[in-house]
Amino acid sequence: MGRVKPKYIKSLAEKLLETYPDRFTDSFEENKKAVAELAEIPSKTVRNKVAGYITRLIKRRKAQEKAETAA
């Protein structure tokens, strides 16, 4: 089991994903760069957690879409 992410990381990631849906992919490295450009996050750790959560959300959405089309 993984760790639970804090609410501020989840809310920031969801807000960025709603505002800039075309800027993010399922690649953590690309998302990390995009988060650094779009949000002023002074901490590298927080930036990486936000980018990781965005990556996870995108992968989850793609898997869900794939499952819906297969069914």
Curated annotation (Swiss-Prot):
InterPro entries noted in UniProt: Ribosomal_eS17, Ribosomal_eS17_CS, Ribosomal_eS17_sf
Q: Which GO terms describe its molecular function?
A: structural constituent of ribosome
Q: Which residues cross the membrane?
A: none
Q: List the disulfide bonds.
A: none
Q: Matching Gene3D superfamilies, A to Z? A: Ribosomal protein S17e-like (1.10.60.20)
- One of its Pfam families is Ribosomal_S17e
**Which superkingdom heads the taxonomic lineage of this protein's source?**
Archaea
Presence of keyword Ribonucleoprotein:
yes
Under what name is this protein listed? Small ribosomal subunit protein eS17
